[in-house]
Amino acid sequence: MAKTIALIASLDTKKKETLYAASVIQKQGFSTYIIDISTKNLVDGADITPVEILKRYGIEWEDFDPLGKAASIDVMSKAAAFVLPQLYAEGKFDVVISIGGGQNAKMAAMAMKTLPFAVPKIVASSLACGSRTMEQYVGDKDIFVMHTVADISGLNSITKTVIQSVCSAAMGLAEYAKTFPSEEGKKVLGATELGVTSKGTENALHMIEESGLFENVVFHANGVGGRCMENLMREGRIDVALDMTLHEITCETIGGYCVGANDRLMTAVEHKIPMVVVPGALDMVDYFINEQGEGLPDDIDQRKKVYHNSSICHCKIYK
């Protein structure tokens, strides 16, 4: 049976480009499923329309249509995030992609983040470049991101090449991506580490590995890694946690580069997952140094510090 690739798009502004992408995929024997997240006008060509998406979310188009731009984008983003996992559970698609500008990419990525680990996801955007943050497109999920180089506005030799590349990647994932079970008879153990805690974590994992009872998975506690571990715990992919690096909590509390983990340690408690906690790196924060050499606190020279590289400085929170 042919695999199906879903395309999340705003057909009111990108219909021609979306249908071209669908034709590229269909010519290779794959099926397509177009998810229209338009917020302005209703057009044909979708497998599920904005009206149907909103209806599943509990909103009628008549109530949605008068909303302003910002409000309509916010509502449609939430509606798409609510509906996409339903569509996946219904078997509507195997891979999901989005090709467009900043607005479409942000909306599509928000929806993709609701899908489980290992469901292939690709966001291609003209804003996936430069100093833009990857948080809005990837966050703590396994989303592939591609810069489209040119704006996806019309079909030309550049945009068609980009669309072909994205579709080819999607077809490759549909054909060859696979998930692996844990080693037979072993529980999966998730552990956190950072450069300054890596020796301790690695020594602990070596001792655990010798027992032959666990498969170890290590997460870089960089503001996202801790969240990734906890997401996999929620999905039932991690059975035991060895949380040896907690400085994400410090950054979340007093500031620093590795922010973004404001609910750390909660998942194991909520899901009754065995967990050993060690306050590794709890007494430090990280600072990102930009190309102009800015980003460090004024009193940095009064504190113990280690430069991880030219861009990141590990700093003690006390003088």
Stretches found by the model and what they are:
Residues V95, M107-Y137, F144-H147, V217-A221, ...:
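Short, acidic/small-residue loops that bind anionic groups at enzyme active sites
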Residues S10-K16, D94-M107, A128, G190-T201, ...:
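Gly/Ser/Thr-rich loops at beta-strand to alpha-helix junctions
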Residues G100-F117, T201-A204, G255-R264:
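Short Gly/Thr/Asp-enriched flexible loops that form oxyanion-binding sites at enzyme active sites
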Residues H247-K319:
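A glycine- and small/hydrophobic-rich beta-loop-beta segment
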Residues D65-G68, S131-V196:
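Cap/lid and interdomain-hinge subdomains that line or gate substrate/regulatory clefts
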Residues D44-K92:
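Phosphate/nucleotide-donor binding subsite
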Residues K14-V24, Y33, T39-V51, E184-G223, ...:
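Glycine-rich phosphate/diphosphate-binding loop of Rossmann-like nucleotide-binding domains
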Residues A2-N41, V95, G101-V123:
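N-terminal phosphate-binding or glycine-rich loops at protein starts, especially the Walker A/P-loop
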